[in-house]
Amino acid sequence: MQTLKINAAEKNKGERLDKFIADNSDISRSYAAKLCEDGFVLCGEKQLLKKYKILGTEEITINVPEPEELSIEPENIPLNIVYEDSDVIVVNKPQGLCVHPAPGNESGTLVNGLVYHCGDELSAINGVIRPGIVHRIDKDTSGLLIVAKNNEAHLKLSEQLKERKAMRKYVALVNGNIKEDSGTINKPIGRNPSDRKKMAVVFDGREAVTHFNVLERFGQYTLVECILETGRTHQIRVHMASIGHSIVGDPLYGIKKEKFNLNGQLLHAKTIGFVHPRTGEMMEFTSDIPEYFENVLEKL
């Protein structure tokens, strides 16, 4: 059993407990609700329900049970493992591979491959459906992803992400010629009120900060490096589209007619850096841009 403690602040007053947990940890809201239902969330000695309203002064204790026997079908999916030890795995995910099972994608995901590779040696923080997953990248985004092999490693890695101490750099090809050599996009992101499948810049969304540097200009296109300060769903895609420079090939936020006949956005998680949860060593990994991405650049 792993224990996580979160101190509420005045700004959290009135928030539902399950949302508060999800916003302040790497635990998903649905799993937070289940932990409440199962009696694993407390304030002092009192068990709390998911609909409990935060007062703004309390300390919330979350007891995360050890992994259940995984119900995910192990699948022998080839994994491009960049690094692995007893605590973490760094995997280079190809475009088109979902990170975890979801309706319509119950198998053939990165998690199915991880369960085959690791057995039950994956953290349980994110529940049975997302064992080991510390953070996610979209199905059609390629690149580096951190996986935790135990709860202690997961909590420490999640804390680094929350405190903005982990480094995540992406490379993207965007539409249009960005005039500035660098910039910062600081716009809150939340669900699109008119399309729940999409995210959008919304005034009451969660804080989202993306830094970008221009790497090369190609007339109608710009190659950029994007550095995440926060990690909201679709953050880079939404932010770049919000300044008029959507990612080439993006089916949700891009232009409708692309001339390159792509299967998804040209967005690659190129570099990731973090402090090892056990040794304290600073680790950094880099992944080359995939071939299909390079092929487009050669045509420009």
Language-model segments: residues:
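RNA pseudouridine synthases
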Residues: 1-300
